């Protein structure tokens, strides 16, 4: 009887551990759920301005910033609705939001940019939650949480303004921080729309 009980616990644990799921939530204030959709199809020369807004207790912010920049560059590589060639492109992390939008619009208008994409990374991290009831359970996940705001330089119109959260995990998962980069990359691809055909 004890063997059957132990076997059942092992099988149950394996079944629960295999229950990994992905969720993605988009909170839109303006525009459509994808960058390259409908009225946003001809964005011209684009500049991407990444920044961070980490928690006060964020671990290894420099490492996460480096991971984020790599994944932003990878995700925007085949952007189908605009050009990232000079003078546009993906800039280094800075505090872009500390400047008034009118100042950014003027600055990048003078540089020949058509569209500004402000991309603020707020979370790029693994989570681990425990319950101390019987049986003891833990749930692990990786999360990417960011805000994206896209502006037309000529008109100042807000083309897109949304918050995106994507996480993957489940019961009995232990996931390293490095896996969070895949969440950011996948979320960026999801909101980008169709990719450029080579």
Where are these regions (language model features)?
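Positively charged n-region of N-terminal signal peptides that target proteins for export
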Residues: 1-4
